[in-house]
Amino acid sequence: MTEQFDSKTFLKTVTSQPGVYRMYDTSGTVIYVGKAKDLKKRLASYFRAQVTSRKTESLVKNIVQIDVTVTHTETEALLLEHNYIKLYQPRYNVLLRDDKSYPYIFLSADKHPRLAMYRGAKHFKGEYFGPFPNTHAVRESLILLQKLFPIRQCEDSVYRNRSRPCLQYQIGRCLGPCVKGLVSEDEYQQQVDYIRLFLSGKDQQVLTRLIERMEQASQQLKFEDAARYRDQIQAVRQVTERQFVSGTDDDLDVISVAFDAGMACLHVLFIRQGKVLGSRSYYPKIPTGTTLDEIVQTFLGQFYLQGSQNRTLPSEILLDFTLPEKDILSDSLSEISGRKIHIQTRPRGDKARYLKLARTNATIALSTRLSQQSTIHQRLDSLTKLVKLAKIQRMECFDISHTMGEQTVASCVVFDSNGPLRSEYRRYNISGITPGDDYAAMNQVLRRRYGKALDESKIPDIIFIDGGKGQLAQAIDVFQSLDVEWDKTRPQLIGVAKGSDRKAGLETLFFATEDKSIALPPDSPALHVIQHIRDESHNHAITGHRQRRSKVRNTSTLESIEGVGPKRRQMLLKYMGGLQPLRNASVEEIAKVPTISYALAEKIYNALKH
């Protein structure tokens, strides 16, 4: 415990009411946030003569100040605690690494409702179905739904400005409500009702209604309509047969935890209307010495209470562990949602099967993660010995990407001792250089990256430069000329050059501190970690360059065609439904656009293709 903090004097002033406390270090940074039913009793426990936890011992040594906020109830304290954790990200708290809001399928409340993926606060009128574990699951579902129930998925701006049906109508993926006369209001609303029932888990009602429609069409001798309903029935049946359904309309989150070697995996199974929407594994950042109870309690608080306004909470949460403050969490979630939310730890029947499934997934996911971490640490140890450092905590790598010198993008990727830190990846648009001058591009990105104040924790131990001696020379020149307060001599500069035929495994390393190069054997663990960070940087640069190039092309391709002015550009995009359908169109299809002659259509076709 530091001499600066007088715990005895402080504790005399603390109330015994419920509330939240924030602990600060010498720099004024919040290092821990906690809550208590009795603030005085809880805070006194940190300053006992004997502290059994290594984590608590380390925490107390760094405390120089404590602030408390009194609340009316424990529930208020729990909510405030997790708001503070999200705000301050204290290093001694268990931190959920990914607190993005979850994606939903959104059915709008328009005259002709649209189906779309949505993430964020629910400001728009309509219905939200989910949550889904990730955007990929939503996109897959939207593709499937478009095949089953062809209602529109286009943006309102496109829908309102159409005079002819787009490609989705032509291939049977949309009924074309944008064009009058293609579909009746009743028929479109039918499909919307089917989607609403289907997403609510009422598959049998959908099938019953479709069968009634098919029989009705057949009796009226409308055989084409009957055949269409028949195909739709078959498609819905194929989908429902593939789904694991509990036979009930359960809305559940099923959570299991696996804990080993200082790492935890919490696996969440999302079940809505009796259907498994998907699952996701979480690996929270855990301070050394943290107990499993604290890991679980903090994870659940952050998972459900942070960003709860954007989330549809389930009616029940199943856990495979005893929760010390189960009632407080249940009351808090019930208060937020406006309905009772139950937390169960000993379910039976189908619910017990769900819990067993989550437990199996948590165990497998943690085992896989530990295996990967072991491999990463072995490779990092090998690299540490190669570069003769005591330890490596942070590495950064740079690459340049462009096409014939145009739309040049530089990438910077960051690795720590556990692998990629993707949240810290950055891209830099390069400008003001001679097109194609990779040396100047590298010089510019390094000056922009390092020619400013850096926190001690952000100074890399190694900087890899994708390139040979020339690129490394640029890095050396930049660092020699830097006028900064942080230790610019700390990072080791290493150039990574591929062999003459640019095959992986034939890389040559150039060191700024030594006038020699090294070619590591292909099976070298150190080489593998270098290849990994170099490939990440390369891919990050290429992706950024392609996005920048695509953006430029999308706005400039049509503008560069002689005879295509603003009005014709607008007509082409409006008639074809956007640039991508226009790219895919034939000369004959382009020539059907009003004011576009066949000769001009050929010119447009060739410009877009070449």
Curated annotation (Swiss-Prot):
Top-rank taxon: Bacteria
GO molecular function, one term: excinuclease ABC activity
Subcellular location: Cytoplasm
GO biological process, any: SOS response
Keywords from the named record: Cytoplasm, DNA damage, DNA excision, DNA repair, Excision nuclease, SOS response
One Gene Ontology CC term in the entry: cytoplasm
InterPro entries: GIY-YIG_endonuc, GIY-YIG_endonuc_sf, GIY-YIG_UvrC_Cho, Hlx-hairpin-Hlx_DNA-bd_motif, RuvA_2-like, UVR_dom, UVR_dom_sf, UvrABC_protein_C
Start and end residues of each UVR domain: 204-239
Ranges where the GIY-YIG domain occurs: 16-94
Job of this protein: The UvrABC repair system catalyzes the recognition and processing of DNA lesions. UvrC both incises the 5' and 3' sides of the lesion. The N-terminal half is responsible for the 3' incision and the C-terminal half is responsible for the 5' incision.
Family per similarity comment: Belongs to the UvrC family.
Quaternary state and interactors: Interacts with UvrB in an incision complex.
Name of the protein in its database record: UvrABC system protein C
Gene assigned in the entry: uvrC
